[in-house]
Amino acid sequence: MAKGIREKIKLVSSAGTGHFYTTTKNKRTKPEKMELKKYDPVVRQHVIYKEAKIK
């Protein structure tokens, strides 16, 4: 069976709350670090989430 090219990543809140989302991304088409604006329920507002490796 073929190995998928999508890699699991963690999106960590830049607000410093420790909240994170997990998702996958295609390493071949998007080699740069991902940054998304998503909702952080701890601070109850939308903040920037930055990509980090899943350990």
Curated annotation (Swiss-Prot):
Going by the UniProt record, its keywords in alphabetical order are: Ribonucleoprotein, Ribosomal protein
Q: Which GO terms describe its biological process?
A: translation
GO cellular component labels:
cytosolic large ribosomal subunit
Q: Which InterPro entries does UniProt cross-reference here?
A: Ribosomal_bL33, Ribosomal_bL33_CS, Ribosomal_bL33_sf, Ribosomal_zn-bd
Looking at the keywords, is Ribonucleoprotein present? yes
GO MF annotation: an example = structural constituent of ribosome
Q: Which family does it belong to?
A: Belongs to the bacterial ribosomal protein bL33 family.
UniProt-recorded name of the protein = Large ribosomal subunit protein bL33
Name the gene behind this protein: rpmG
